Regions:
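Elongated, amphipathic alpha-helical interaction scaffolds
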Residues: 1-189
Length: 190
């Protein structure tokens, strides 16, 4: 490469075997779905067979670099298999779960990649115009009835009614390992 570029190499820096990340790359959550099952729950309707989910904490904003990092993870997940095209691109989705509407990121995606946003229902937005289906879930905008648990996974539950209601609903399921994990996450955010 350097020889081919000749005189222009003085303007370039070459870094062979460049490490892409200082820490191991990991996906927040990978949701695998059986191919023939169409998910009916509103947050999972977009799901295909392999679904990459990125969570942002209530304190964090979703920015353009987060978008590209997760998009790259989806591409690496698709490509890093034993056989070529083992994971078809058509079977991938990306879900971003956050607490603040990422207006700046979405404006940049529209400007640079012509990706548009379609509001599917309260708190659920599809990012249209890319080969990989993507959705954006804004937790505080979700329906409090349809998405009770996700909506209450935050650090600003109001004392009294909200907390009492959460504890009552949790109490009915406290023996479930999933609900115990949810309570642990809730404690970590308080």
């Amino acid at each position: 490469m350097q020889i081919e570029l000749g005189e222009e190499t003085k303007y370039l820096e070459f870094d062979s075997e460049h490490l892409l990340s200082k820490k191991p790359m990991q996906i927040d959550v990978l949701v695998k779905n059986e191919r023939h099952v169409k998910i009916q729950k509103n947050i999972g309707r977009i799901f295909r067979q392999y679904n990459i989910v990125e969570y942002k904490s209530p304190e964090d904003d979703l920015n353009i670099d987060d978008f590209y990092k997760v998009y790259a993870y989806a591409c690496i997940y698709k490509a890093d298999t034993e056989t070529v095209d083992f994971i078809p691109a058509a079977e991938l989705t990306i879900t971003f779960v956050c607490y603040h509407y990422p207006r700046t990121m979405l404006q940049k995606l529209h400007r640079d990649r012509q990706i548009t946003v379609e509001n599917m229902e309260s708190g659920i937005y599809y990012l249209m115009g890319d080969a990989i289906p993507m959705q954006l879930i804004i937790v505080p905008r979700l329906s409090k009835t349809n998405n009770y648990w996700l909506n209450n996974l935050r650090n600003d539950l109001k004392s009294g009614g909200e907390i009492r209601n959460f504890i009552e609903k949790y109490g009915k399921n406290k023996n479930s390992k999933l609900y115990q994990a949810l309570a642990e996450i809730g404690r970590a955010h308080v």
